[in-house]
Amino acid sequence: MFEKTTDMDIRCNIEENGRISKPKDNKEIRETQAKMPSTYLKEQPGTYPAPGSSELCAKNKSSSAGDPEYCRRILVRDAKGSIREIILPKGLDLDRPKRSRTSFTAEQLYRLEMEFQRCQYVVGRERTDLSRQLNLSETQVKVWFQNRRTKQKKDQGKDSELRSVVSETAATCSVLRLLEQGRLLSPPGLPGLMPPCTTGTLRAPNSSGPGTRSLATVTSTPPHQPGLHPSPTGHNIFNMPVPSLLGTVANRLSSHPLTMAGNLHELSARYLSSSAFEPYSRSISKDSLDKKLLD
């Protein structure tokens, strides 16, 4: 009994599988389509929109219709020559003309300059009255004062630099004038501005014995040596830089060495030996002086 039932179940399963795998006839397909709704038949399998695209299109249409400043797409050509589409942000209008620069009349500039000299910051009611008198907006007056303050700061920086250069030049000229008049006897000598004279006691080793003998003080003026005249620019007087504007003063002083000869001989040998130019003067004149003394 159990075996017969099993055979019957297997036979039924085979028949059901055959009915499922058997294709339907055209008549059955037409009957099935007649029962389906018409909306389902209109949609084809390859024409489904991308997910979210319908919502985006609807949003774009509604926003573009309600907002005149809606973003727009334009085609641009990049550096490689390819054309691509970019989206301009909302509120950016390339067709809008640029704001023209405000041009002030001579009368307006004169009044603004006078007010700036009186007070550099005009705010509140004063700015309102001034803008009404000059037929300008408060923003234009405000921007003009801001630009004027910036310009004044730049001018003050340039004036301070020029003032420092002028003060250094005046101090150097006063020192040189005192040197020329003989009133200043203590500062170190300037090889570029004084005649090539040598003052001091020089010692040379004695070749005949281990001791040393002192040589006479040399007060004569040796011949002109080009190495003793370095350029006056760049040297220091009391740690003050000498600018290049003193070229005329140096030429005037060097053209009259006789007026400075007596004063320069009175300068102490201690300052001359401790001068900042000592390595230059001693290294150059030592060999020539030794040769003269040995002769």
From Swiss-Prot:
Cleavable signal peptide: none
Q: Where is the composition biased (Polar residues)?
A: 204-222
Gene name in the database record = vax1-a
One term under GO cellular component: nucleus
Instruction: Name the species this protein comes from.
Output: Xenopus laevis
Residue ranges of the region described as Disordered: 20-63, 203-226
This protein's name? Ventral anterior homeobox 1a
- Tell me which UniProt keywords the record has, alphabetically: Developmental protein, DNA-binding, Homeobox, Nucleus, Transcription, Transcription regulation
Domain of life, per the record? Eukaryota
